Amino acid sequence: NEKLATGEIEVYVTDIEVLNTSKTPAFQIEDHVDTAEDVRLRYRYLDLRRPKMASNLRLRSDFTFALREAFHNREFLEVETPSLFKSTPEGARDFLVPSRMQPGRFYALPQSPQLLKELLMVGGVERYYQVAKCFRDEDLRKDRQPEFTQVDVEMSFVTQDDVMGALEQTLADAFGRMGVKMELPLRRIEYWDAMDTYGIDKPDTRFGLEIQDVSEVFRGSEF
């Protein structure tokens, strides 16, 4: 099969011993196979062999490496904060881990490294970053996951413009390593302009149906 990476290899068999039998795969290991998501997840080890999935893993690895390099070049220090910490309720519920040594007491998985990175700032680490695992015990939605990875960053003794400038340049360098050129500076929009124009503080500015204030048009009417 010349479509496979090893398709041109031929083997001349003189003896075969069957050590075990295998079931027919649940789906073909190809990108364009129409397979239900629950089947793909049940046979994840097969799904990861598909070229697209393997490429996604490689892309994530390469981009994470590029981010780390970009932060390192700007004298940021990567610090792994603990995954077992005290419960510090934020916007969601904590995942609790019972303590074997202290019955009835619990650790909590961090919703974010917020308190821990603040300790680093007090301790003299003025530029910190981490590719951090976060855990939030909340209902599953498109933009809500119980476990996710975020790039966590903190800087001391800086202004708002310092933070935005450093992150812009870091992202531009990382994307540049991936062959994507970013035009700097990135577009900036004031909070109230975003709310007045789009009705949300994180708008997709490609959306053409902007909010229009028609108060003057209907002033004095019963509408």
Show which residues each predicted segment covers:
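Class II aminoacyl-tRNA synthetase catalytic cores and aaRS-like
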Residues: 1-223
